[in-house]
A protein has these predicted regions:
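Conserved catalytic or regulatory cores that recognize and/or transform ribose-phosphate-containing ligands
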Residues: 1-153
Length: 153
């Protein structure tokens, strides 16, 4: 599957090991992951972009999200840009897994309930299982249950 991964560029130095752990896990499961815009960019390089380059960068991000089957966002560090990307993915009807490793879940995301938005606290030990469960869910491999009513005559 095609995965769009995002996280805070400004907190990349602190969270790069987590970003890499998530991306490496997805790649090991043979998923195609778009992530280089996060791991190869710096806050300074983004800030130095002129308007034309920022718009082109934003257009690329939109196309990557459109092409993805789902999104994974590492949100341990608050980021307006990541929130925007999540909102865009949801608007495009993409399933989104929001991961955070410390503290409380992102408050604005937990306020709303969407069947395509899943928020999970993770550790290095359980992140793979969380990702697998999410992928099984969006592939439709989760349990389907029905309630049948029988009328007596």
């Amino acid at each position: 599957m095609k995965v769009y991964f995002t996280g805070s560029i400004s907190a990349k130095e602190a969270y790069l090991p987590q970003y890499n752990r998530i991306v490496d896990y997805l790649k090991a499961k043979n998923h195609t992951v778009t992530y280089e815009h996060i791991t190869n960019s710096t806050e300074e390089s983004v800030r130095k972009m002129d308007k034309a380059h920022r718009l082109a960068f934003h257009h690329k991000i939109e196309n990557w999200i459109k092409a993805a089957d789902f999104m994974i966002a590492e949100t341990s560090f608050p980021s307006v840009s990541v929130g925007y990307e999540i909102a865009l993915a949801l608007r495009l009807a993409k399933p989104v897994l929001v991961l955070y490793s410390e503290g409380d879940p992102p408050s604005l995301l937990t306020y709303h309930s969407y069947d395509r938005l899943h928020t999970e606290k993770y550790t290095s030990d359980n992140v793979g299982g969380i990702i697998d469960d999410f992928i099984h869910y969006i592939e439709g491999k989760h349990d389907t249950r029905f309630t049948f009513f029988f009328l007596r005559k």
